Each structure stands twice: as structure tokens, then as C-alpha cells.
Amino acid sequence: MAFLDNPLIILAHIRQSHVTSDDTGMCEMVLIDHDIDLEKLYQSSVPGENSTQMQSNGGETQGYVYSQSVDITSSWDFGIRRRSNTAQKLERLRKERQNQIKCKNVQWKDRNTSHSAEELGSLFERKNFKERDLNHGKQSILSVRLEQCPLQLNNPFNEYSKFDGKGHVGTTATKKIDVYLSMQTSQDKLLPMTVVTIANAKVHDLIGLICWQYTTESREPKLNDNVDAFCLHIAEDDGEVDTDFPPLDSNEPIHKFGFSTLALVEKYSSPGLAAKQSLFVRINAAHGFSLIQVDSTNVTMQEILEKALKRRKGSQRNSGPQYRLEKQSQPNVPVDLDSTLESQNSLEFCLVRENSSRGEEHPEEETQIDIATVQDMLSSHQYKSFKVSMIHRLRFTTDVQLGISGEKVEIDPVTNQKTSTKFWIKQKPISIDSDLLCACDLAEEKSPSHAMFKVTYLSNHDYKHLYFESDAATVNEIVLKVNYILESRASTARADYFAQKQRKLTRRTSFSFQKEKKTG
């Protein structure tokens, strides 16, 4: 390390050892300004007698200071040297030689031998492409496959073949379903037909795919060309159709249903098959009723009683309390179980326990079940969701998604980013089994845009109430749907709830009567 006190030497050292030029030239201007200032300062500090000597030395020093170094250049390309003319000429010659290699010179020579016109014509013979023999040539694989599968061309359900998922396994979400075919003979009906469909297909598309595969496999009997003539029902593993539930909605996607076994059933909508239309028998019981589906009126009352007892949870024919059937219009008159439904001239009966009576009732006129009401009752078991507001104790509301099906009621909170939940308790999802539901009542209806209903259910041996609000149309639909589900299920919790409610009402009436008697 060196210590210098002479600014002139420092400036000279910077010029000789460093690059002081840039694109703007500002660095050189700064150094030159310092040189001028130092020169004036040095001349003013020197006595007059030595002025001549210092002028001579200053001239040498000034020349030394302003002398440019070899390393100082005017730009950053000081390390690049221009190519000489010889190098450029050699590069041009090299490119010309490469271009000459790509060219081929052909020397033209006159022919020594003479050829006739026929020989010359055979060299470039004209061919007629219009006259082509169609019998010659190899047959394509597509033509061979079309000849081997003549039914593929005549299949009326070809438009549904695009929903076949056998060629999409591993690449697209698919669903494998075993389908029982009710229209086949008794032996073929026992074996299901395996169908692989893409997951985003609808139920209507799956029905068309089943018909397409049925026709492709040349099964008998032949199907109706109309896909709307069929429907899909839930089936057991042994192929028995579960008639307790309605058919799957044709507009819903198939991935919404988690059933791996279904049954293809014909709707019997044509006038010629009206005799095969299913009938519904209403069986009234305590705090509810059941709808029994029968194929014809030739079924015995014993079979209807067994189906009605099977509907009741925990009730068996050979164990527990015994039951009998009575006509709704004829109380305390048991029905002959060996007789047929046709001989009863009624479709509404009452299920009564043995050695008991349902009381003296006034004979009622025989009521015919409305088919539209039956369809509403059956469709009530299908899943449907509603967006409502749940009312809490502090009267604040929470938006929830209310999902209702024949098995359970689900309450899922709807997350809203705009609503702050800092001061409120976060709503948790709630799932209520249908056997634990007790009641669903309309609590308040102020206007068509605002109504409130109450849901009562059993939880840990205690009855709890949930309040919801929405527009009047939605509330009425929810109340009607839940009540249809409650009436079609003989729930023990619902029966106990009404019994407890009746006891409270009786106790309240008795208390008020005694109070009036004392005051009187």
C-alpha cells in the first residue's frame, strides 16, 4: 500500500492504470476539470522568482498528465480486432467451394444408336386412369369388419355407442354396472349384462347404451326402438327389482348414483300393454301409511300383508306381534288372506295388531288414489337440494344447502367469502337419518318472499328443533317432500314423538280443567 499526497501523481496513475472512458464521456470531463483546478492552484502558490522554472516543469507535468494511456479506449470493444482483407477473401472462397460441391455437372452427348418410334413410345406410355378394374386389389380391413358385423349397420341405438367406456379405461373416468334385463326369459334373466359407461353420461344415455349393447350381442327378444320406453330401477345382487324406490331420473348424471347393480325395466306406456300397468295398494298404519306395488289384481292378500310387514322396521311375520288387514271402510272386519285383491274391490286397507281394535270409525267412502299424488310420493324419495337460511338462537342466519332424500337429510354450510364469521360460530355439517325425523311443520308465512319452517328430530334421546327460512314456494315444497317421506316410513321415533306430544296435550287439558273447577 502506498500513500501519496500529490494529486497530480494520483490523476496520472488513474489514467495509466484504469479505463476512464465511457459512452457519455463524463469521466474524462471530471478528470480534466480536476487537472485545470490543480494547475491554477499550483501556479498561485509558487513565488515569482521561480516562475520560469516552474513553467518549464509545469509544461512537462501538464503533458504528462494529459497524455492518454494505451489502455484507455473510447468504447468497450477494445479487445476486438478488425479482420484483415485476406481473411475475408479466404472465407469467401471457402463458401464458393461448398456451393460448387452441391452442384452436379452433366455433360450432354449426342446418341449414337437410333431407336424406333415404338421403342420411344414404350418408354413413356400413356395410361388411362379412368378405366380401372374394380375387381382387382386387396380388400381393406374396414370392409372386412363391416361384412363380419352386419348388425352394426342396422342397430337403431348407434348414436349411444359413444358412451361406451370400454375403450376409455385408464384415460377417462368410467363406471362399471351390472344390468339385469327383465324382458329376457327366466334363464337369461338370472345373469346380468356388464356395461362400462363413461362417468359423465346421463341416465338416459346409459339406457341407450344398454339397448345398443343388447342389440349388438344379438339377444332376444328384440327391443323397442324408442329409448324412452325403458327406465332403470335399483336392483338387488340377485336381480330382484327394488320397487320401493322410483326409477332413476333420466336427466341426472349416472355418477350421482352409487349403485353398481341396476335393472332395465319397460315402462308399459303403450295402450296395448295397459293391462300390465302396476297398481299401488295403500296400507294405513299408526302415524303413517305405506304404498305396496303389485303387478296385477290377482295377487293374494297374504302376499300384500307380508310386503306390508316387511316395510315395517323390525316386524317379522313369524315373530313378535301378529297383524291383520282390514278394509279402511270396514273397521274391525278382518280380510280373508287367501282371497285376491280383485275380490276386495278396494285399494286401501288398514294394518291392525291382533287382539286390538282401531276404534269405532265412521264408514268412509272408498277413495281412489290419485296417480299424480302417488308419483309425488314416490319422487319424494329422490335426492334434491335446496338453498335456504338456517336461523340460530341469536336470530342471525347462515346460508346452508339442505339436501333431502328418502334415507337422510343433510345440512351443509355454504361458504360465503363476503360474510365475515369472526364473531359467529362456524356452522358444522349435520346429517339426520330419516328414521330419526319426527316432524316438519310450517312455522310462519309472512309473504310470498319469506316463510319459515321447523324440522324436529331425535338426537341422544332428546328432541331437537331446527328452523329455516326461504321463499314461500320453496318452504312449501320442502315441507310437503319431508312429510311424504315421513308418512311412507313407519318410524319409531316419530311414533314416540307424537305419543309424547299427545300426553303433554292431555296433561295440559286436565290441568286447565282442574283450575277452572277450583275457581268455579
UniProtKB/Swiss-Prot annotation:
Binding of a 1,2-diacyl-sn-glycero-3-phospho-(1D-myo-inositol-3,4,5-trisphosphate), residues: R393, K428, K464
One cellular component (GO) term of this entry: early endosome
Keyword Transmembrane in record: no
Entries under CDD domains matching the protein: PH_Avo1
Location of this chain's protein in the cell: Cell membrane; Endoplasmic reticulum membrane; Early endosome membrane; Late endosome membrane
GO MF: enzyme-substrate adaptor activity; phosphatidylinositol-3,4,5-trisphosphate binding; phosphatidylinositol-4,5-bisphosphate binding
Protein name in UniProt: Target of rapamycin complex 2 subunit MAPKAP1
Biological source species: Xenopus laevis
Taxonomic lineage of the native organism: Eukaryota, Metazoa, Chordata, Craniata, Vertebrata
